[in-house]
């Protein structure tokens, strides 16, 4: 149904929840009309995936509605589970009645074919006799509740709806159905009593087992036995895993995008702990009971429950390494490792920190309990993490792309990277034993270094001696065969710390190129001289111009450029470092974590309006939800609303259509917000001068 086809009652059915909605409650920016409730529930960043899943289910379900047999007696079950003798007892008259289509049903089937673009070159009887199941809703089984609690948080639109008899036998090439959406009765082959292994299909000759478009590994040719790697619980578990991973990626996205502003408002003990732990990422972890199950911790954050002032440490773990499969808690990844190790899905784990071990230094074999590094007192920020327990960061060159890079990449590039990574690790994930790729550590003589003071996901360095050419990068942002973006004189590349270099020892550095929109306000080194470091000077430019200054020996020029039209707002920071004395000497000291200020916004000064630059009261102003730097006073917001016209869509007062996070849809003011802003001048007390 298109946007213009609205019923006479001015109500439109949502494609997902199928409830009648008024036009103002519908959103037409996606491939199907959906209501605002479904978009808010699923999230704008994954609503297309839910729509595509629902489209696949509706495709298969439309055949059942248009070609399913009429009501049967209460004693009849699903026809594809009937005894062969009962199947043989069907007379020609019964067959004709079962497959009879009246005018209304034909029209419904035709509309379904037209809507979903399926061909009608199918024989009249080439479909499965799928009767309505006596219990369950339209053949959809009840979702399983046997999995761990963390894997059961699902939306009603993305549950494992793999009921029997939903997808008929099709001509090959007509419909490409993912294996996790194919009913189990069709994947398992025919019942044992069927002669010749032919399925229950009334038609012109036996149907081949490949008529579903199922991959050869999922369908058995001539063997009626059930595939050993496929079961209904496996399918439900796979759907739950996809849902859990999507939720974890959403949490990661929210954590990285709001990191700078949120960390600025947290207590000093929380900020110090987060900065210290972030400087040690990524590092490897393994399961205590099976050392072949490896993952890596790549991000930390602090979360607090609503209404409470206490913060709790939150960590993000990728398991298996290089799979881009994210877990947002230690207990979650420990449960998954335990399931992969013991194949026991009923037992739960008390604490993931007791079952995970981390390697203090890569290749040293010094594995320690993660609970010793992060005891309860550290996880609740009562004590600082022990410096002697901190691991050294290590990025495996065999899988250099961290999941946090997916947050920063464009959507098409991120999807391609996730697809290639999942394809490469699919064999390991399905075998039950997940191992990390083995690859040699790069030679320390290659001029590569590890910058420990920057957050995860942005450790992309390119090393070159002074006067030489920057080292080439074989993968931009960790994506194979992608050209590096033109961000500066060097190509961004994630590197690993040299094995021979001490943790905080000297190491050569040439350029830091890319800081993506994970930070609204990037970390900038403080001025000063510490541990033989050259003084670091930071020059901040406005959003519309870039300041530059000549690079002199023993100095660092920082340039910050804020781009308000790069996705949902981004900040780029480029540091150009000149070696001391102008000679290619490898003895330049590394930027240490202690040079990073306690708060990334400590020196940002008072809040000011983006338009008039007047000082803002800290609780009464308009904040753009997409671009952190877009802050507006009420008079400027009122003028912008009047200029745009309060009767239509009113976008960001900056004059730009700032998109929502994870979407291309621009945000707009609600009518209540417009009324509040236009109500009159709000007299508030402004912040005093310090």
UniProtKB/Swiss-Prot annotation:
Low complexity biased stretches: 419-431, 464-480, 538-556
InterPro entries per UniProt: I2BP1/2_C3HC4-RING_sf, Interferon_reg_fac2-bd1_2_Znf
Name of the encoding gene: irf2bpl-a
Species of the source: Xenopus laevis
Localisation: Nucleus
SUPFAM superfamilies attached to this UniProt entry: RING/U-box
Zn finger intervals (RING-type): 609-656
MF term (GO), any: zinc ion binding
Family: Belongs to the IRF2BP family.
GO cellular component: a single term: nucleus
Entries under Gene3D superfamilies matching the protein: Interferon regulatory factor 2-binding protein
GO BP: any one term: regulation of transcription by RNA polymerase II
Coiled coil start-end: 231-263
Chain intervals with Basic and acidic residues compositional bias: 234-245
Keywords of this entry: Coiled coil, Metal-binding, Nucleus, Zinc, Zinc-finger
Keyword Nucleus: yes
Protein name as catalogued: Interferon regulatory factor 2-binding protein-like A
Annotated Polar residues bias: 207-222, 557-567
Region (Disordered): 59-87, 134-251, 419-599
